[in-house]
């Protein structure tokens, strides 16, 4: 039995779609589970839309979520000659033919199909056309000659056996009239040359699979195993598209979703193992199988993603969380100065308790990350004469404290509450605004302890405040 080999084959025409990430993950996990190999093929034959920057971003995105590939990337555009050679061989052996139908004729056929509310299938007009009767002024396309008798059976490892009438499969184009190969030819030749044993992809590819199976048979190549996974839908039950919000991997990393959390979510999106919800990477590899993939579409639930992300934020240690925060800020916010580590890292113990994303942590930690406090007019309006007196007196009392903790700070706050006949908010709010620039955020004592005596005194002496 051949060693398992799977692949992920994105087109570098834009950011990596979340559905593609799940497909890559399932292929990667299956190959790892079987001690096989996982390959990345860049399908860049659309020269107008394919960009190097998209290819680079796809590779970075896969790496971000923990998916690595074996060997170098397989670049489809470098194999076009091989694709063309196979097309010519199919033509020579009678498994393909030249089609001279004009674009106007094809459009008319499509129009009639739409009027009858039927799927378009080429009418095979040129299938048996003799070369001597072919028009000389039209450059032909080459179509594959489908074996139209009988049925084709796809032995799908997820969907089970799927059977269709061969007459419903059109004689599809394999070479355009400019000599360039089409998707179904290129993908089939590549999969054969790469020795792929398992093709795991979305179930919107099923009709392509029936076409590609006929190429395999015509070329006397061994068929790989096929597994078609259900598509991802929106929470409303519609097919997820690139136009939907949060449809690309970048959309999730940008708001501070952690790689492990998103990988865990995508693993469970359409796959299950007993009633287990949280999987380590090691468990994912050991337990993943194709039998656990369901047949129905799965709904993308942002609230569930946030809940999982919150779980990961709260359960990983502060050293790991700090590393994630540093990387996140470097890409999407502002680079954290190395000297801030000693203040931020201990503060993560309380900062992560109110956070669902890395962005939440960043927003709550701004007062530590940045030395200069930025105030909004609406918050400064809350600093009246009474608030200024509270800030000034707290600063004076703080000088006598050597160790900052709740036990040393609470008596000072309670004295001020009593003296100014107010409540905790009456004391805490002006202090919080003076120290962080906001009336919201972490607990007052946590803020003071994390900043330290010297920095607290400096900020409470800010002329903008007092």
Swiss-Prot record:
Its main location: cytoplasm. It comes from the Bacteria. It is an enzyme of class 6 (ligase). Zn(2+) binds at residues 99, 101, 126, 128. Keywords: Aminoacyl-tRNA synthetase, ATP-binding, Cytoplasm, Ligase, Metal-binding, Nucleotide-binding, Protein biosynthesis, Zinc. GO terms for molecular function: ATP binding; glutamate-tRNA ligase activity; tRNA binding; zinc ion binding. GO terms for biological process: glutamyl-tRNA aminoacylation. GO terms for cellular component: cytosol. Transmembrane segments: none annotated. Its cofactor is Zn(2+). The keyword Nucleotide-binding applies. It is found in: Cytoplasm. Binds 1 zinc ion per subunit. InterPro entries: aa-tRNA-synth_I_cd-bd, aa-tRNA-synth_I_codon-bd_sub2, aa-tRNA-synth_I_CS, aa_tRNA-synth_I_cd-bd_sf, Glu-tRNA-ligase_bac/mito, Glu/Gln-tRNA-synth, Glu/Gln-tRNA-synth_Ib_cat-dom, GluQ/Sye. A motif ('HIGH' region) lies at residues 10-20. Its EC number is 6.1.1.17. A motif ('KMSKS' region) lies at residues 239-243. Catalyzes the attachment of glutamate to tRNA(Glu) in a two-step reaction: glutamate is first activated by ATP to form Glu-AMP and then transferred to the acceptor end of tRNA(Glu). Belongs to the class-I aminoacyl-tRNA synthetase family. Glutamate--tRNA ligase type 1 subfamily. Monomer. PANTHER family: GLUTAMATE--TRNA LIGASE, GLUTAMATE--TRNA LIGASE, MITOCHONDRIAL-RELATED. This is Glutamate--tRNA ligase. It comes from Pelagibacter ubique (strain HTCC1062).
């Amino acid at each position: 039995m051949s060693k398992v080999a799977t692949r992920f084959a994105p087109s570098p025409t834009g950011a990596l779609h979340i559905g593609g990430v799940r497909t890559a993950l399932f292929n990667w996990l299956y190959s790892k589970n079987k001690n096989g190999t996982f390959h990345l093929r860049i399908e860049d034959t659309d020269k107008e839309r394919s960009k190097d920057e998209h290819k680079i971003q796809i590779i970075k995105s896969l790496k971000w979520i923990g998916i690595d590939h074996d060997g170098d990337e397989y670049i489809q555009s470098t194999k076009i000659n091989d694709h063309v050679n196979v097309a010519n061989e199919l033509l020579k052996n009678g498994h393909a033919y030249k089609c001279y139908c004009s674009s106007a004729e094809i459009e008319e056929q499509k129009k009639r199909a739409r009027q009858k509310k039927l799927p378009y299938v080429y009418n095979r007009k040129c299938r048996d056309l003799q070369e001597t009767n072919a028009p000389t002024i039209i450059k032909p396309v080459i179509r594959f000659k489908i074996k139209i008798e009988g049925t084709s059976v796809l032995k799908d490892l997820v969907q089970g056996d799927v059977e269709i009438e061969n007459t419903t499969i059109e004689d599809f184009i394999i070479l355009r009239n400019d000599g360039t190969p089409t998707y179904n030819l290129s993908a089939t030749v590549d999969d054969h040359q790469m020795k792929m044993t398992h093709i795991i992809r979305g179930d919107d590819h099923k009709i392509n699979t029936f076409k590609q199976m006929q190429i395999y048979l015509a070329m006397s190549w061994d068929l790989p195993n096929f597994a078609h996974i259900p598509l991802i839908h929106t929470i409303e039950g519609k097919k997820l598209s690139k136009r939907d919000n949060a449809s690309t991997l970048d959309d999730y990393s940008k708001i501070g979703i952690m790689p492990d959390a998103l990988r865990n979510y995508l693993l469970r999106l359409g796959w299950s193992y007993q009633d287990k919800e949280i999987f380590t990477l090691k468990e994912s590899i050991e337990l993943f199988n194709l039998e656990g993939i369901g047949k129905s579409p799965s709904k993308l639930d942002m609230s569930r993603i946030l809940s999982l992300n919150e779980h990961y934020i709260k359960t990983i240690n502060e050293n790991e969380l700090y590393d994630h925060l540093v990387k996140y800020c470097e890409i999407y916010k502002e680079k954290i100065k190395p000297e801030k580590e000693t203040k931020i890292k201990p503060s993560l113990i309380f900062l992560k308790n109110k956070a669902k994303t890395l962005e939440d942590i960043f927003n709550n930690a701004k007062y530590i990350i940045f030395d200069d406090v930025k105030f909004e007019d609406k918050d400064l309006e809350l600093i009246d004469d009474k608030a200024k007196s509270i800030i000034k007196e707290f600063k004076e009392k703080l000088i006598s404290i050597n160790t900052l903790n709740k036990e040393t700070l609470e008596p000072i706050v309670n004295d001020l509450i009593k003296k100014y006949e107010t409540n905790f908010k009456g004391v805490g709010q002006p202090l919080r605004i003076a120290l962080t620039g906001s009336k919201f955020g972490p607990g007052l004592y946590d803020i003071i302890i994390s900043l330290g005596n010297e920095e607290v005194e400096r900020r409470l002496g800010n002329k903008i405040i007092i």
